């Protein structure tokens, strides 16, 4: 009788195990992105060739957009910010840099870099755990009772500008535009914001303050995190043109060169070469596919995203294992064929994306482009950016300067 009882117990346990396995298999099975896109009116256009991906719905995904200034990172950030189940933060490492690195050094020394990277990794680790209190160490003046009005670009985060973190007058689903967020929301309560973070399945952070993917290795290998790195790159010539227009004082000598046709003797060429060196070092690491980056790294060229934003966004979400939200699809539809007058704000995201990616060719003189091509020839070749052999070729929009490359995720 005792043996029969044990046999029944074993059978029951086996049955539970089988059911659990079946449930796990079902929840992790492939879901097609098209049902969500149908709500945005995009299914007919996208579903025929849209790939299917296996989605992991049980574990929080931690996403880091690794980029540099004027590479399209604000646009990529919005691809996550618009997802209803993603908690997105725009440049929280700004606070680290602003607190630790003296403005006059701009963080260029090796010592500054080590200090910045160590503090940045600690902060990122805490933020991915939704520990927003850790950010208070870098906010001036210090928050009082965990409330502050000093969060950098708070308005760029959808969650921080909507209920329950912000309670403006209006409908329950109201999300404020960035310019209205701070004015109408008042002080940010970090306790409430942290709770909103914990309620979401994924956390995404954008940064332009980590030079290379190798600087993130400790976080990538941290078993407590499910970190996936989206490295965004852009043609360095395009970055130079965009920075010269946006940061007019800092890049004054480049503008002087463009205006006079003569290269200033005291031109700070590191404003260009540092970008190229960081890209080259980071991409070399990523494309070598070291074991610690397996399933953790995806290289995205801004030009590919600009030419086909929906297709590339689907690939990104597929790599992350997250279903594509219809709100993201709708945002792409509304913000990649925009009125050019709406894209004049230097940090704006409403634009004709394909035209924006090529605009640099008409904003730099050929002698500046030739100089950049010589200084950055290694990374241009690595990333598939073609050399403009003449001014005629540079200014001819029918001649593409971007090679067809398939930078597949390392999975």
From Swiss-Prot:
Q: What is its main location?
A: Golgi
Residues annotated to bind 3'-phosphoadenylyl sulfate = 69-75, 234-242
Give residue spans on the Lumenal membrane side. Answer: 24-411
The entry's keywords: Carbohydrate metabolism, Glycoprotein, Golgi apparatus, Inflammatory response, Membrane, Signal-anchor, Transferase, Transmembrane, Transmembrane helix
Membrane spanning residue stretches: 3-23
Q: In which tissues is it expressed?
A: Widely expressed at low level. Expressed in brain and skeletal muscle. Expressed by high endothelial cells (HEVs) and leukocytes.
* Cross-referenced Pfam families: Sulfotransfer_1
Cystine pairs annotated here are none
**Does this UniProt record's set of keywords contain Transferase?**
yes
* Function statement: Sulfotransferase that utilizes 3'-phospho-5'-adenylyl sulfate (PAPS) as sulfonate donor to catalyze the transfer of sulfate to position 6 of internal galactose (Gal) residues of keratan. Cooperates with B4GALT4 and B3GNT7 glycosyltransferases and CHST6 sulfotransferase to construct and elongate disulfated disaccharide unit [->3(6-sulfoGalbeta)1->4(6-sulfoGlcNAcbeta)1->] within keratan sulfate polymer. Has a preference for sulfating keratan sulfate, but it also transfers sulfate to the unsulfated polymer.
Q: What is this protein called?
A: Carbohydrate sulfotransferase 1
Annotated organism of origin? Homo sapiens
Phylogenetic lineage:
Eukaryota, Metazoa, Chordata, Craniata, Vertebrata
């Amino acid at each position: 009788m005792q043996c029969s009882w044990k046999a029944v117990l074993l059978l029951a346990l086996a049955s539970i195990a089988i059911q659990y396995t079946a449930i796990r298999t079902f929840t992790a099975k492939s879901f097609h992105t098209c049902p969500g896109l149908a709500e945005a009116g995009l299914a007919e256009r996208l579903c025929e060739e849209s790939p299917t991906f296996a989605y992991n719905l049980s574990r929080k995904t931690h996403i880091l957009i690794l980029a540099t200034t004027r590479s399209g990172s604000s646009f990529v950030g919005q691809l996550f910010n618009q997802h209803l189940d993603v908690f997105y933060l725009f440049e929280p490492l700004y606070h680290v840099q602003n607190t630790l690195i003296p403005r006059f050094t701009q963080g260029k020394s090796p010592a500054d870099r080590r200090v910045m990277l160590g503090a940045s990794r600690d902060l990122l680790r805490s933020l991915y755990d939704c520990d927003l209190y850790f950010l208070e160490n870098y906010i001036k003046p210090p928050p009082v009772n965990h409330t502050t009005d000093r969060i950098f670009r708070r308005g760029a985060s959808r969650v921080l500008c909507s209920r329950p973190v912000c309670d403006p007058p209006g409908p329950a689903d109201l999300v404020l535009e960035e310019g209205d967020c701070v004015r109408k929301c008042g002080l940010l309560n970090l306790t409430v914001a942290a709770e909103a973070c914990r309620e979401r399945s994924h956390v995404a952070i954008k940064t332009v303050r980590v030079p290379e993917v190798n600087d993130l290795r400790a976080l990538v290998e941290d078993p407590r995190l499910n970190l996936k790195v989206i490295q965004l790159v852009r043609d360095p010539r395009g970055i130079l043109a965009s920075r010269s227009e946006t940061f007019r004082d800092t890049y004054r000598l480049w503008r002087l060169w463009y205006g006079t046709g003569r290269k200033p003797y005291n031109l700070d060429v590191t404003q260009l070469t540092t970008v190229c060196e960081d890209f080259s070092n980071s991409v070399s690491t990523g494309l070598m596919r070291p074991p610690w980056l397996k399933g953790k790294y995806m290289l995205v060229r801004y030009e590919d995203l600009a030419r086909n934003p929906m297709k590339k966004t689907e690939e990104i979400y597929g790599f992350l294992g997250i279903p594509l939200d219809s709100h993201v699809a709708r945002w792409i539809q509304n913000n990649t064929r925009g009125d050019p007058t709406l894209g004049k704000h230097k940090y704006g995201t409403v634009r004709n994306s394909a035209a924006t990616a090529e605009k640099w060719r008409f904003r730099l003189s050929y002698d500046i482009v030739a100089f950049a091509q010589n200084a950055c020839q290694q990374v241009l070749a690595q990333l598939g950016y073609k050399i403009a052999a003449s001014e005629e070729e540079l200014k001819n929009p029918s001649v593409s300067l971007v090679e067809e490359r398939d930078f597949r995720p390392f999975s």
